[in-house]
Amino acid sequence: MRARTDRLRFLVAIVLAASLALVPVGVALASVNLPLHHWAYDAIERLTALGIIDQAMVVAKPYSRKQAAQYVARAIERIRADEIRPDSREILAEPLFERLMAEFRPELTDLGTIVRKRTEPSSTFRYGARLQTEVDAFSVGGGQTVRFRENRGGEYYANGVQNQTDVRGWLEVGDWAAITVQPKFISNLNALSHGPTVGPLTSLNDQYVYLREASLKLTFWNVALEAGRGTQWWGPGYHGSLLLTDHAFPLDMIKLGSEEAFRLPWKLRDLGEWKINSFLAQLEKNRDFSHAKIFGLRLNYLPTAWLEVGLTRLTQFGGHGRGQSFPKAVVDCYKNPPNQTGTQDCNEQSTIDFRARVPQVPYLIPFPGGMQIYGELGSEDKWSQVPIPSRAAYLAGIYIPQLFKGDTQDLRIEYADTDYTRRKTGLVGVWYNNGNYTSGMRQYGFPLGHSMGTDAIDMYIRTTRYLTDQLQLGHSFNYQERARGLPVHERKQEMSVDLTWWVTARTHITLGYTYQRIKTPGQISSITPFVETFAPGVTATNHFVGMSLSKEF
């Protein structure tokens, strides 16, 4: 009991020490978080890349419905004040704003951006829900029965026809509490795994219904305390991020941070906007050290409207038999040199990332809406060298929100590399692995960060285009090599196409097809230590077809 009290005190101290001097940009009110991959994230990022939304922190996710509404409200104010010149961007902006205003109407009404109707009285209790259901037909070739799904919370493609359905309900109480619950049904048990997928230690899922996410968030002044199960994405990447994504099964955790961006007081106010995020999570039971802990800390900084910078650090410690307690173990890890032993030992990762908007420049940046460049540089263990750490990985990308004037096509190109250290030093299996924590920085064998894992490269290209205001067509290409440090490693080529139909502003249907050709496919064969077994001489040809419906209430 005392240990739990110490943990909570330490987390509270991190934010409160800063928050006592913080000046919130606006009144911070309790609000439920938008789930990762909600369509509003893409819409807000696109409008930010176009320069229509400014002063927006969009890298760290999730953020709340109220925060999203504030970004939309700010853009509406700029449009009403004629701060945005009429040009070809409106062909993209108008349908996006229509959907965003329908989605966040209650929040925009509270902000005064939209006039409240007489039939819409303010209420102490605000609630809503989202229904998602998908029907899939998967064919996994090469003698394989499952294939991991990237950024799907520990899920797998599993042979056969199946259904997945979840309902995400939320409730806000006054200005201080927000509750979210999301149970999920899967008709194929093999669509989820709690351990190895091949070999004598195979541990597949045995539940048709499980709790995907659930949380209670309390907000006071500009401090948000949240407890429950959930996912986070810390990094500017679209197809992955080095430290934290939703590739692995959702984490059970306590989160503490600033609910909204803030400015420093007095003369420091002009330095820009800041935001702090932290969490303490518990990993699964059946691993090297049962219920090992992860502490994460992130500082977001927006010095100007066109640039966002972030610093992130993850610390793995504790677990059954380790003799470590929180917060002492984290403090020791922060102050000690690397490669300690005994109760001083820990596993760490850190990154610095940025997102920058580059406006249109004649003959140099010909795109009508400009472009966005972003990147992430990470270190496994301590950042022992400057500027490039000795155990580095990186991610870089460009996003063009509007390729041609008067058109709606966009383009994203993203490259990630966790094989950099092996090529430079010869060290194999550095990222997501650790000599003492032999299960690594993983949950059920899935990396907490990028889905490609260690010693890997990933090239991702995606383009979308609106055929009409209600129909969006998307194409993606992905080339990936995993575990390049092994004599036999995996090579994947993937192509996909998807069509989204917005039936109404709050209902959409998506049809999708994915083709994969994988040479030497890999499967998890052990968690302790982590081992992935690759099938030499095997080429798997996979076909995935699916249809999903999403309805907001």
For the regions a language model picked out, list residue spans one by one.
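Signature for the C-terminal beta-barrel architecture of outer-membrane proteins
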Residues: 233, 253-438, 454-461, 466, ...
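Outer-membrane beta-barrel "beta-signal"
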Residues: 299, 352, 501, 539-553
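Bacterial N-terminal signal peptides
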Residues: 12-23
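Extracellular loop and loop/strand-boundary signature of outer-membrane beta-barrel proteins
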Residues: 152-155, 197-202, 239-244, 283-285, ...
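N-terminal secretory signal peptides that target proteins for export/translocation
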Residues: 1-8
